[in-house]
C-alpha cells in the first residue's frame, strides 16, 4: 500500500450528503480523497469516477477543459444511483502541477495543443500515477467498479493494478467552442473515447 486512510467527515453537497475520506501517501505525505455516497459495501459493482484535480475547471469554472463539467455530472450520477465513489486524485494538470499547467496554457495560447505544450515543458503527455487510486479502492473495500471515464488508459492501468472494472461508463460532457481543440487532441493523441 502506498497510502493510509487518515480522516473522514460528512460533506453535505447539492447532490446529497457524501462521506469524505482523506488518504495520505506514505512516501510523500501528499493527500487525496474519496467522496462516498450511500452504502458501497458488498460485491455489487460500485459506480465510480477517478477525477484528477483541476483547479481551473473544478473551482474556477474554466471552459478550456471538460473537467469541471465531468466532476459535476459524476457527482450527479453517483447520487442518482444511490451509491458510489468519486476519487479525487490530487495530481493537478495531469500531474505537472498548477504553475506548469499555467505555463502549458500560455503555450496553448500561442498555438500548441495540450500534448505539445506538456512536451515543450519537458513532461510526458500524462504524468499521472493511477496506482494510488487502486490502493484507495482497496482501502475502501471496493471489489468491482463501473468506471465513469472516457480514458481507456485509466481503465487499463487500474485493471493491471488489480481493480475489477466491469464496465466503462462514458462521461462525455462539457463540449464548448473554447475546448473543442483540447478535446480533439485528447481523442487523437491520447486515445480518449469522445464520440457519443
From Swiss-Prot:
Enzymatic reactions: GTP + 4 H2O = 2,5-diamino-6-hydroxy-4-(5-phosphoribosylamino)-pyrimidine + formate + 2 phosphate + 3 H(+)
Catalytic site: 126, 128
Cofactor dependence: Zn(2+)
One annotated Gene Ontology cellular component of this protein: cytosol
CC cofactor note: Binds 1 zinc ion per subunit.
EC number(s) per entry: 3.5.4.25
Chain residues that bind Zn(2+): 54, 65, 67
Enzyme's top EC category: hydrolase
Protein residues bound to GTP: 49-53, 70, 92-94, 114, 149, 154
UniProt keywords, alphabetically: GTP-binding, Hydrolase, Metal-binding, Nucleotide-binding, Riboflavin biosynthesis, Zinc
Keyword Zinc included in the entry's annotation: yes
Biological role: Catalyzes the conversion of GTP to 2,5-diamino-6-ribosylamino-4(3H)-pyrimidinone 5'-phosphate (DARP), formate and pyrophosphate.
Matches recorded under NCBIfam families: PRK00393.1 (NF001591), ribA (TIGR00505)
Assembly description: Homodimer.
Protein name: GTP cyclohydrolase-2
Species this protein is from: Yersinia pestis
Gene name of this polypeptide: ribA
